[in-house]
Amino acid sequence: MAIDSGLIIQCADLNAVGGVKQILLTDISSVATVTPAITSAPADHTVTSMTTSADWARFEFKAETAALSINATKENGTTAYECSISFHVPNMEAAHSVAIEKLTTGCPVGIVEMHSGKAFLVGFSYLYENVGGGSTPWIRNQTTANLASIEGGSGAAYQDENGLTVTLVAKQYELPLEYTGAITPSADGLTAATA
């Protein structure tokens, strides 16, 4: 790719809000279709739609505790992006543990929606697809978000918080793609559908 165009920072960019609004996770094997369906990153760096065979699990968290962080490194001419999703779930209880435990064995792909209205795919890469995968070449791309850690507990004092902080990490070979398709949460708020 030639460096033939720069970028412009507008006033709105300087006043953009930060923070994560919601986190959606599904197993890579649930991803049925992706648009555009190409074998390299789209030129405009967006995915316009994604359908799944099962709804996305929707994770809520304590306000201002969720984060998406990206760290790029270049080795032997290849740039890899380590993308981390972390969030804090307050109040340890069985229902929370059951949902979090499911992350220990899956191969998650995430959509991280920001308060700015932008959403980004984590754990999905066009650049590391299995070309023998037929109509779903992303199924075995090995860039999914793995559970890196679950940390938590309770403090000693009565007013201390208790809860768990979950961190998922994906090593992918392009910056997270912007997802511009629809996200529709279910009535109970536990899942969401994409289109």
Regions found by a protein language model. Name each.
Residues 2, 10-86, 135-158:
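Solvent-exposed edge beta-strands and adjacent loop segments
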Residues 129-195:
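Mixed-charge, glycine-accented linear interaction segment located at domain edges/termini
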Residues 20-27, 85-90, 105-115:
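Short, hydrophobic/proline-enriched secondary-structure or compact coil segments at domain edges
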Residues 100-126:
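Short, acidic/charged, Gly/Pro-enriched secondary-structure junctions
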Residues 72-95, 160-174:
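Oligomerization/assembly interface segments of phage tail-like spikes and tubes
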Residues 58-62, 120-126, 180-181:
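Short amphipathic beta-strand/extended segments with alternating polar/hydrophobic composition
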Residues 76-77, 100-102, 111-112, 156-160:
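A general structural signal for short secondary-structure junctions and capping/turn motifs
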Residues 94-101, 177-179:
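Short, conserved charged micro-motifs
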